[in-house]
A protein has these predicted regions:
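Auxiliary Fe-S-binding modules of radical SAM enzymes
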Residues: 1-90, 96-99, 103-107, 113, ...
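Short linear Ser/Thr-Pro motifs
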Residues: 72-73, 120-121, 201, 224, ...
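Short beta-strand motif preference
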Residues: 80, 92, 119, 221-223
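Residue-level structural signal for beta-strand termini and adjacent loop
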Residues: 94-95, 178
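Canonical Radical SAM [4Fe-4S] cluster-binding loop centered on the CxxxCxxC motif
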Residues: 98-103, 109-146, 159
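Glycine- and other small-residue-rich loops at beta-strand/loop junctions that grip anionic moieties
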Residues: 141, 198-201, 334
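Cys/His-clustered metal-coordination modules, chiefly Zn-binding fingers
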Residues: 150
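Conserved AdoMet/S-adenosylmethionine-binding subsite of the radical SAM
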Residues: 155-163, 168-326
Length: 373
């Protein structure tokens, strides 16, 4: 039987409890593995003798390996290709930003350089969004909570990660229990990520949204809306047929009432599909009763997998102006990052590139995570 990841919390907790070993040693083990990913269990000091026996027989420090790390030409994006225990591959992306750029309320921002990690929750995806390369893979498998956390472990060796966004491969809310457990690990010792620095993105899995705040309070929710009318959503997001827009908006209203937090609305800009001014007005009317931040995302090419084209800059700016000036909705335009390594939004699809050398970050960008929500 395959050995389990030490970061699969429910597994290691159950084994420790069954063996009568205090679970307070688990974060100690995690900290050592983060600092020494190739360690032997006997190298961890001060564990009970029974813990060493259990770890050797049931667990490995990491079940995955970092296969390649490809850096964008501008040095701000690194795409990680990670090989899983059963031979599948998944991807994660490190994006580097400077939170000091720009102003907030007319004042210079505080902060500095830091990195956001875009994490995958599945290999492939069931949702089949027409503008997303991952959907072309179909669904392969769910990641375990340990495999999700291990992406953070691998990335932390390359950059100091402060923010995590579940916007990589897969639909996070379709792997709900592993998602919840992984985030509980990330926000505890020794990672100590703030829940407010974690964003979960979904196409709109209504039954999961209904319980999300109870299981993961204080995280950020992002919804891939992409159209303000159901027929266009279904055209570009086939899975939307299972989640009617009116029911989705009801679920978001209930979520916001409970969480008292703004919601990110993701809206990919597709030329001639969802970018005209009438749709901007429809989106504004749909969202004006909510506290939201709309993030307009220029479409990133995915080669022969799609015939879509990105909206031109004038259309994107006009769309933003309509939402912001007429409906008072805070609207940002996502900066395109990592296109040259297929690490941008919608471009994640497993391939096996040649390894490229890692460099240092010289250019930095502002991030939607710096919006005060």
């Amino acid at each position: 039987m395959a050995l389990k990841s030490v970061f699969d919390f429910s597994q290691i907790r159950a084994e420790f409890e069954q063996a009568g070993i205090n679970t307070r040693f688990i974060p100690v083990i995690w900290k050592h593995v983060i600092q020494n990913p190739n360690c032997q269990w006997d190298e961890i000091p001060s564990l009970p003798s029974g813990a060493y026996v259990l770890l050797r027989s049931k667990f490995v420090p990491l079940t995955s390996t970092l296969h390649t790390a490809d850096e964008s030409s501008d040095g701000v994006t690194t795409k990680l290709l990670i090989k899983l225990q059963k031979g599948e591959f998944t991807e994660a992306v490190i994006m580097r930003y400077d939170s000091r750029l720009g102003k907030y309320n007319g004042e210079p921002r505080h902060g500095g350089l830091r990195s956001t990690l875009c994490i995958s929750s599945q290999v492939g995806c069931k949702m089949g969004c027409k503008f997303c390369a991952t959907g072309s893979m179909g669904f392969k498998t769910n990641l375990s909570s340990g495999e999700i956390v291990e992406q953070l472990v691998h990335a932390s060796r390359l950059s100091s990660i402060r923010n995590v966004v579940f916007m990589g491969m897969g639909e996070p809310l379709n792997n709900y229990s592993a998602l919840v457990e992984a985030i509980h690990v990330m926000t505890a010792s020794p990672f100590y990520l703030s829940p407010r620095k974690i964003t979960v993105s979904t196409v709109g899995i209504i039954h999961a949204i209904n319980k999300l705040h109870m299981d993961l309070p204080n995280i950020n929710l992002a919804v891939s809306l992409h159209a303000p009318v159901q027929d266009i959503r279904c055209q570009i997001m086939p899975a939307a047929r299972a989640f009617p827009l009116d029911r989705l908006m009801d679920a978001l209203h209930a979520y916001q009432k409970k969480s008292q937090q703004r919601i990110f609305i993701e809206y990919i800009m597709l030329d001639g599909v969802n970018d005209d001014e009438q749709l901007a007005h429809q989106l504004g009317k749909l969202l004006e009763a909510f506290q939201v931040v709309v993030n307009l995302i220029p479409f990133n090419p995915i080669g022969s997998l799609s015939d879509f084209r990105t909206s031109n800059d004038q259309k994107v700016t006009r769309f933003q102006k309509t939402l912001r000036d007429i409906y008072g909705i805070r609207t940002t335009i996502r900066k395109q990052m990592g296109q040259d390594i297929s690490g941008a939004c919608g471009q994640l699809v497993v391939n096996l590139p040649k390894r490229q050398s890692l460099g240092t970050c010289s250019d930095v960008l502002t991030d939607i995570e710096d919006l005060h929500i």
